[in-house]
């Protein structure tokens, strides 16, 4: 067992109209854990999500703060609609910090279970400040109202291994794994300024941990600089009204309309449920907007080799729900299952590749002059983990 450095107990707040009314502050350097009130002013002026992130970041930093300054914060928040199950896109977490790439505030929008589970555990936002002396893990049990900070020296470094281990560690059984979400970054974040964060969710159909990424601005680099190995949250008992919205009847009515529109129109317009955001590859190529060979051109005659249809026909599992939160009929979090790696430290293994998103297909494919879907997916996996 890892050495426990700090424990903290709290009474989980009941969600009222999308808010718990509390935020969680953790200083990973001196191990302080504090509760802060979410005021009516904050809700009125900043709403939640990125608004709350920027509010807390504004009060944490100075004009002299750099990305690797101890006072720089990583702030995470799900807005007042976070975690509702009536329509798509509500599993989002908004993450902000001073970026190592720009030296100004950056925000990144990520799917998965962490934001909703954090909110239902009683927290509208999470602030992480300071720097730990050694790698640590932070675990929040939202049902028991218990927070643990412990040493993390014995854990794998790469996210696909780390999240699998932590999901199994904190889940009581196979059925309980859907109640656990892990935030982590991989070994690359120690060496580059563009490191990103993986937000996990457990896929009970595939029986594997999957990821969405907060990939903008180098958030994973800050995470590793603070010596945070992983954040883990656990909450079970999700229901359709856990968010306790102000007007559930209207929410249900709007949700039904929303689901019908996606069902009727998606195949005609975007094919998000078949390919996700990579549906735009050939559209961008057609309009001379596909970044190719380091933006020398806006398209290429070989672009068809990484077209959406190639990924749909040859790589991405079809006919299975791919939402990254309950009730998301957009179902755009596509996956290449049992994908055989040919290179790198995991060569010969079959892995789950989350993607490709458009940014991966364009950035790791066309923009590098690579029009090989196998190579794009392989790079996708290694960039993620």
What feature does the model see in each segment?
Residues 1-109, 113-385:
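Intrinsically disordered, low-complexity segments enriched in small residues
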